[in-house]
Amino acid sequence: MAVFRFAGLIFRRPKIQSAFLLWIYAMLYVFVRDMWDVLRLRYRSPETYLYSPLVMVAVLLLLGVVNAASMSPLFGSGAAAVCLSVILVMVKWLVLSRSMRKVLHYYGAPRLPLWGFILVSEALLLPLLLVLYVPALAAFALLWQAWVFVVQVRGLMWMGNATVGRVLVGYVLYGIGMLCVGTVILMLFIAAGWLDMETLNQNLQALTSARQ
């Protein structure tokens, strides 16, 4: 408790508050700048994609919100659904980074720290939130997702000095790992009573019928 009181006294000082806000803005500027560079296929060494934990958590939470909105027809829009979406986004980031590192290293690349680059490339999906407010952008959203995938693949090829086939092997490994881990997490949510299996089945049937 004394530590929290001390921290509270420190952050009440205007100079410290201003310095902290400037640091946050600087980190966000670096992250957004890296997003812009990656979007234009301008890559750097993976070791240079370093960000503060606060920025990384904020980006993952935003991606979780976008993911929750896209999955709301299946899982609903409750707190449990949002929590599940955020967890799945974090798991996706970890599994994809780890899978690509293992596959690229297997094919001769050094053990690359891909956490930062994967996060930057995944953050390019944040504009998809606009589709919820402007449904007419749905076609553009598909093109945007395709380009983000190309951006990520090209970056991994460049960083790992690998062919597109080897990178796709990494995506296969990621898909298998994500399917296993995601299924376990979903079952835990259902077992805990946070999600209802019958409701999920009804939503899935409604989605299937709507697409037919």
Regions found by a protein language model. Name each.
Residues 43, 74, 78, 103-108, ...:
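Membrane-interfacial segments
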